[in-house]
Amino acid sequence: MRPPVRASLGLLVAWAIGACVCAAAIETTWKHASAGDEVRLFALPAARPGAPPAKVVWELDPMAACGSLRPSWVSLRPPGQVLDTVVDAECVSEPVLLAAWYERRDGGSEVPAPFWGPDGAPPQRGNVTNGTLVLREARVGDSGMHVLSVFHPPNATAARHVVFLKVAPRRPEPAGGTPPPRDDEEGGTEEPATPAPPPHPHPIAEVAHVRGVTVSLRTQTAILFAPGDTVHTDVSVMPIAHDDDPYVMEVVWVRFDVPEECGEMRIYEPCLYHPQLPECRSPADAPCAASVWTERLAVRRYGPCSRGVPPPRCPSDAAMESRAGLGWYGHTVNLQLRDASEASGGLYVCVVYVNGHVHAWGHVVISTASRYRNAVVERSPPRYRPPPVEPTPSAQPTGPRPAAPRAARLVGVLGAAVGLAVAGLSVWACVTCRRARAWRAVKRRDLMAPTYIRLADDELYGDLSSYGDSDDSEYDSDSDRLPGTDPAPKRGSGFQILSGAKADPWSAGARQHGHLITFRADDTSRYRDPSSPDPPHRR
């Protein structure tokens, strides 16, 4: 195919996909066929009298990887429901443009004569018979979603007709028998030789949103400017409430710098929903990764809103970081950069929160042409970069650190030992001081003071006895007194008080009397206390 033809075909494919999204009317049917059958797909609409030629597009979306498809009830605008099919976008192959043409009349006939394909060549197995688009010699590869879009100028509203076609391999017919009859259904569609399931089996339960809020966000992905220009974003946010519960919607703008050393910026979508992940906080490809932001550039808040009063009709407020040239573009959720410079450029991400949860997001790169970097969306989390280890292995202690409870017990034991030692020293000091005072008191005793040396010979308290009338006793004689002693008092305690000099038996005065009885020197140790060398003092 020539390059201009390829370009035209690419435009037609994009135009056909857009038609599938923006169609005004949708009609969906299901057909089953066997390989080699002729399948009547669409009945071409009649031309409008006096209307410009309509544009017709026939495309095929292969769905061989989607498994078995069946009808289901889908809630597009609750509580209304339509019978349709829910298909995972990941299993749908690239659309194939089968034909596209403008209607034209032959001899004033109201039946359109199609002008096949961009190069005027009709498809090999497609044909229009009596106003019906027919697929001849169906194959297993023709299974999928066939879409016929008819655009009527001048407003280019499209009517879409969708047929889910399932082509099964033909089974060999039994020998010697007649094949089962084929019933024409839906305009003569031929059924396979074997009985096929009904075109409308029992629909499954609802699979679309029936509660909550669905948010649709559309934006361009790049804005180029020259220094000094005034530019603004073009983001469209459309919330659809599926119930009457109130909700709060926040449109948050964040900005990431685009370093010159980065070949491209990577946006990790899981980090928008789970910013607390360790790999999001420390990505391996930082600073070329847009994973977690620390501050919000601008926020516009709507709420409380409801299905009857959606944004922007519900109450709203806005907040924005103070930056030169940054402002809101009117009363919308878009940003405006006045007198933009290279410092104003960067990766801008718009995130829509509903009741604190992420519901939609988009991004746009605002930059000059010389510093433009592409942004790539990654569906998986980034690789984790461990934080650097600050201390070196040699600086770490070799042995294990003692546990805190063991250290506390050791401190307690040492404290108790010190306390016992202090108490013992205190007791020892007190005893030593007491003994020293007692010894000093004995050393200071005056030997000349009166001292008791012996008991009296008379009966103690003799004046109170029955013999108290007698003046003298047989024991009161001068011969019984020690030399140098005074006679004992007649009516006293019975003790003899001696002077210091006289009381000493070994003194010179006592030795003058020959009848003094003394103890031998070798016997004195038996009668004296060795621990008390001095005589007892006066009581």
Curated annotation (Swiss-Prot):
Residues covered by region (Acidic): 468-480
GO cellular component, one term: host cell endosome membrane
Residue spans, topological domain Intravirion: 432-539
Signal sequence segment: 1-24
Subcellular location: Virion membrane; Host cell membrane; Host cell junction; Host Golgi apparatus membrane
Disulfides per UniProt: C262-C288, C271-C280, C305-C314
Motif Internalization motif: chain residues: 452-455
Keyword Metal-binding (UniProt): no
Region span, Disordered: 168-203, 378-404, 466-497, 517-539
Assembly: Interacts with gI.
Protein name, entry field: Envelope glycoprotein E
Organism: Cercopithecine herpesvirus 1 (strain E2490)
